[in-house]
Amino acid sequence: MTATARLTRRDETVVELLVGAGLSKNLAKTLVCLSKRSETTSVEIEKATGLRQPEVSIAMQELRSRKWVEKRDIKKEGKGRPVHAYHLTLPFSEIAETLARDARKQIEVIEENLKRLRQYT
């Protein structure tokens, strides 16, 4: 994917699957974009996903808090805002497996709650 390439139809399908697994759409788009490049900047993610800067920033904060993404400062000549490059810390397949494990845990909790609820009906 070049810096300005938009997400493909296949990418959008992956985004929808991630949303179905519980991620927000912005988080899913950002994650898919990151998975297609070894390293990228926020501006490149904005162009590829159609998200606005604040949306990408919030998604990156969440991905970094999950330890799925690392940030690297890029040296820039002159003044202005610093530029950061981002990359996934895990293969996308491991992130997907983490989401699957989390979903299974949630299902177990819901099933246990429903089982306990039946005792009161």
PLM regions with names:
Residues A28, P54-E55:
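Key DNA-contact positions within bacterial/archaeal DNA-binding proteins
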Residues E44-A48, L63:
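A short acidic, leucine-rich amphipathic alpha-helix
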Residues K29-C33:
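Pre-recognition alpha-helix immediately N-terminal to the DNA-recognition helix
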Residues L90-T121:
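Amphipathic alpha-helical dimerization/coiled-coil segments
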Residues E16-N26, T41, R72-A96:
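Short, cationic-aromatic polyanion-contact patches
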Residues A3-G20:
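Short, Lys/Arg-enriched N-terminal segment that forms or immediately precedes the first helix
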Residues K67:
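Glycine-centered, phosphate/nucleic-acid-interacting loop/turn motifs that mediate DNA/RNA or nucleotide
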